[in-house]
Amino acid sequence: TYTGIDGLTIGVASGTDSGGSVEVDNSTRYITYAYDAFTFGFQSNSMDSGTAGADEEYTAYAVSYAVNDDLSISYGYSELDYEGTSTLTDTTQEASAISVSYTMGSMAIAATRADVDNQDGDTVKDGEGYEINVAFTF
């Protein structure tokens, strides 16, 4: 992890899982940067499996904006690429969400709208969701 510039964080990690019958190599890279009321983030992961058609590539980014001390808005987007096999084509899961949150004293209220296409690499699994959350701190 690198944090030598104010507001900037960069990280890289990798590892190998050889506990199962097939070895899997994983790696991740990320960067976040906070400037004034904005925070930006980007992440990329890869999984390389010894099993044919099991590799995955993940990419995501997000941005948030603090309108003031109590109100913030954020947006995120991600893609997860599934490697195909000789009988299955490559597919990409896409997801996005937008959120808004407001804090007033010990109470917080947040709302999110999210969409996903090709969930788990299945081209007929699309969905959307909504959430409203109210939290109290005592």
Name every feature range the model reports, one short phrase each:
Residues T1-F138:
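Outer-membrane beta-barrel proteins
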